[in-house]
Amino acid sequence: KNAITTLLTLLVLVSCRPHRTGSGMMFETDCPKVNEAWELAVKTVRYNIRDSILAAGADYGGEWTRDVAINTWNGTDLFIPEVMERSLWHVTDGRRTVGHQYWDKIIWVQGAYYHYLLTRDTNFLKEAYICSRNTMKQLETVAYDPSYGLFTGPSVFNDGISAFEEPIYDASKPDLSGVMRHNTQNIKCLSTNCVYYMAYRALNEMHRILGETEHVEYAGKAETLKENIRRNFFS
């Protein structure tokens, strides 16, 4: 489902003639096949708009935080910015904190930041910064392991236990596919911690844009987390 939006991002890099229309950004190239691919990708994305939000697709039944964030990150704001804004807010709790699966929900911060970069909507950014800040504070309390200097929880996108081996996978629960039904609460994953690193950087950029100064705390935490990632995963 996110392969389509990755295609959209790649098309932006192709030699093209972008222009705005009433329904968003359109692209034209000198290659008919690329134009056809663009049209197919846009139709596929639009097909998955349900109740004015971009759904995760197939039979998932609605939106998911990581899907919304990654779709925004991959460029869907170029042609459905209003839908993506509604989708981003739809996975929050009253626009105060990000909801849904806790371990990688911080990816919403990156999605919200990219939404701003593509729309330049400062009012959105002000609210998104508050929501992002509150969510990071929450996760620093419940998901941070100071002994490693890393955040806990499963890896990004792996919400099914088939992605993990024993002993994380509990062989006594073969019928339970949900990742949180197994021994995943205290593991530390590279992808998830990289998302936290990006979130700290995005928070710093949001603060800089809104306040015209660097947020020393977020910038420092990003660097510290990067060092801890390198030490724990690569040394």
PLM features: residue spans?
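Short amphipathic alpha-helical coiled-coil/interface segments
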Residues: 38-41, 132, 218-233
